[in-house]
Amino acid sequence: METHHPGAFLLPSYSEMKSSGCQFPTHTPFHKLNPSVLGCHLPSGTPHCISDILSRPLPASHSGMFPGYPTVQGYGSSSVPGTCYGEQGNILTKSGTPYTNQSQGGWTDIEQDWRGGNPALSSASNTEGSSRKKHTRPTFTGHQIFALEKTFEQTKYLAGPERARLAFSLGMSESQVKVWFQNRRTKWRKKSAVETPGLPSLSTRAPGDLIPSDNEDDEYSKPLDPDSDDEKIRLLLRKHRAAFSVLSLASHNL
């Protein structure tokens, strides 16, 4: 009856060891063997002996450390098989010609756009900046225009406190109220000049008739303070009352 020892199937039989040509005594322990004895005299094509393993040439994958034009494989290799690196670090094809910038992923073009700026974006930003610089006319609501017109019917000029109070009540700035009154006065003067063409001339005018001159009109146009300019307001109203009476007589005669 044969006795089967554990792990015996892992060791070659004596006949196999003898046929393989390895020559060492069977009674000598394996760890006490001379390394020269382990170098089996196998045929040149057998890759199992230590001498054959040590005498093998280095694989082609490790030859990248040497100069030349090695094929890049493994870590950091190119996705294109057969791609090589030259001495200057540029990528070469199989034929030895370097890749163009476009074949390397187009990074050069992106870098140029990043450094030089995108002309489309720069033109758009310039257009936006120019549109912001354009002066836009202020728009007023119907309520604001109605209040301004009613105030203009009462007085053609506003003093500083009145202008500030009106601007605050309408939610406007003082400059907007001031400009609106300036434009409205200009329109009112033009309209008054067109509607009163039959005014008596200087030759037909009575000596006591008072027609407001340009200086008087300028005096009337100046802002008045109701608290300190009472006498000035009284004189201006008297002059303009006489002028209005002359205008009313001229209209009745027509």
From Swiss-Prot:
GO cellular component: nucleus
Skewed-composition ranges (Polar residues): 120-129
PROSITE patterns, per database record: HOMEOBOX_1 (PS00027), HOMEOBOX_2 (PS50071)
Disordered, as annotated region: 112-140, 191-228
DNA-binding region: 133-192
Stored InterPro entries: HD, HD_metazoa, Homeobox_CS, Homeobox_NK-like, Homeodomain-like_sf, HTH_motif
SMART domains in UniProt: HOX
Major localisation: nucleus
Record GO terms (molecular function): DNA-binding transcription factor activity, RNA polymerase II-specific; RNA polymerase II cis-regulatory region sequence-specific DNA binding
Pfam families linked to this entry: Homeodomain (PF00046)
Record has Transcription regulation as a keyword: yes
Signal peptide: none
Protein localization: Nucleus
Function: Putative transcription factor, which may be involved in patterning of central nervous system and pancreas.
Protein name (Swiss-Prot/TrEMBL): Homeobox protein Nkx-6.3
